[in-house]
C-alpha cells in the first residue's frame, strides 16, 4: 500500500473505528468509519485539487454537502451518507424529474451566499490554462472558447466557489 494513502495515522489521530471495506476512486481512497459512535467516511486524497476540495467542503459547513468533522492537507473526515435514495437509481426507474429537482436543490444550497470570506482556492483563471494553451496551439474554435472564458471572468459580479464535480452519482442521501 502507498504509505501516503495509509489510513492508520488518521484512525489513531481522530479516534476512528473501521466500519466497512476501503474503496478507491481515481483520486482518493475511502474508508467507512465510526467517529464518536456515528457513521463517518475517511477520505485520503492523492490529487492536489481534491485537497482544495477539503477546504471548500469545510467552508460549506454541511449546507448541501457532507459536514466535515476533521481535515488536514491530505485527509478528510466527513459525515457518511446513510440514506437509501440514489439519484442514479431514480433516473434508471424513470423518475428523472425528481432526481433533477433534488440535484438542483443541492446545487442551490452549496452555491448560496455565505458569511465570511471565501476559502483560499485555485483561482478560476488557472483552470482555464489548458484552454489558453489550446487556443495558442490550435486556434479555431479554441480562440472563441478562450475569448468567451476571458469575457466571463472579466465581467463576473460575484465570486462563489463552484462544485466542479456535481452529478447524479455525487449527490448522496443523508437521510
Regions found by a protein language model. Name each.
Residues 11-14, 107, 111:
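Hydrophobic, Leu/Ile/Phe/Ala-enriched alpha-helical segments that form helix-helix packing faces
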Residues 1-67, 71, 174:
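Conserved NTP-binding catalytic cores of kinases and kinase-like/nucleotidyltransferase enzymes
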Residues 25, 164-167:
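A short acidic Gly-Thr/Ser loop motif
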Residues 37-42, 51, 55-59, 111, ...:
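Extended interaction regions within the primary functional domain
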Amino acid at each position: 500500500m502507498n504509505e501516503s494513502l495509509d489510513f492508520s495515522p488518521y484512525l489513531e489521530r481522530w479516534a476512528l473505528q473501521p466500519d466497512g471495506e476501503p474503496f478507491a476512486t481515481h483520486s482518493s481512497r475511502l474508508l467507512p468509519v465510526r467517529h464518536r459512535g456515528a457513521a463517518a467516511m475517511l477520505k485520503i486524497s492523492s490529487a492536489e485539487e481534491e485537497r482544495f476540495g477539503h477546504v471548500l467542503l469545510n467552508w460549506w459547513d454541511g449546507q448541501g454537502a457532507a459536514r466535515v468533522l476533521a481535515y488536514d492537507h491530505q485527509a478528510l473526515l466527513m459525515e457518511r451518507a446513510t440514506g437509501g435514495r440514489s439519484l442514479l437509481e431514480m433516473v434508471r426507474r424513470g423518475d428523472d424529474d425528481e432526481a433533477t429537482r433534488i440535484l438542483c436543490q443541492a446545487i442551490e444550497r452549496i452555491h448560496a451566499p455565505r458569511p465570511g470570506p471565501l476559502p483560499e482556492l485555485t483561482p478560476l483563471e488557472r483552470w482555464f490554462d489548458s484552454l489558453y494553451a489550446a487556443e495558442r496551439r490550435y486556434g479555431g474554435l479554441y480562440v472563441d472558447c478562450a475569448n468567451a472564458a476571458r469575457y466571463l471572468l472579466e465581467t463576473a459580479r460575484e465570486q462563489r466557489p463552484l462544485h466542479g464535480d456535481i452529478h447524479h452519482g455525487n449527490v448522496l442521501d443523508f437521510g
